[in-house]
């Protein structure tokens, strides 16, 4: 997408069925509420990443992706990179493929805008 600000963007998020892990995602949603035009909770991380890559979403974030999520996330990562998007951990570091990660994907234009809320 060409959206250059969190304001007016479309953002998706994922969360675990484990309440202690999910609370972090819900806290971020509460912080950014009112800035994006829409905040969606749709499906698996791999689908969210592909929707960022094709421009349906401007960004997606999910805390605490587990090791068993890595195959889906790594496939989605290739799609993001091919679309010139941006994929990192919430702290800005590269995703580590053999451990749990807090993942953020963006169109590359709103990374800094979103990352300030992912603490």
Q: Where on the chain are the PLM-derived regions?
A:
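An extended, acidic
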Residues: 2-119
């Amino acid at each position: 997408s060409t959206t250059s600000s969190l304001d007016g963007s479309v953002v998706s998020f994922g969360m675990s069925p484990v309440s202690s892990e999910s609370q972090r995602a819900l806290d971020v949603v509460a912080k950014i509420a009112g800035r994006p035009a829409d905040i969606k909770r749709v499906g698996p991380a791999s689908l969210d990443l592909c929707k960022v890559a094709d421009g349906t979403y401007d960004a997606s974030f999910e805390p605490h992706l587990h090791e068993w999520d890595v195959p889906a996330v790594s496939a989605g990562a290739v799609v993001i990179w091919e679309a010139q998007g941006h994929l990192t951990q919430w702290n800005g570091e590269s995703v580590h493929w053999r451990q749990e990660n807090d993942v953020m994907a963006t169109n590359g234009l709103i990374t800094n805008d979103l990352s300030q809320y992912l603490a």
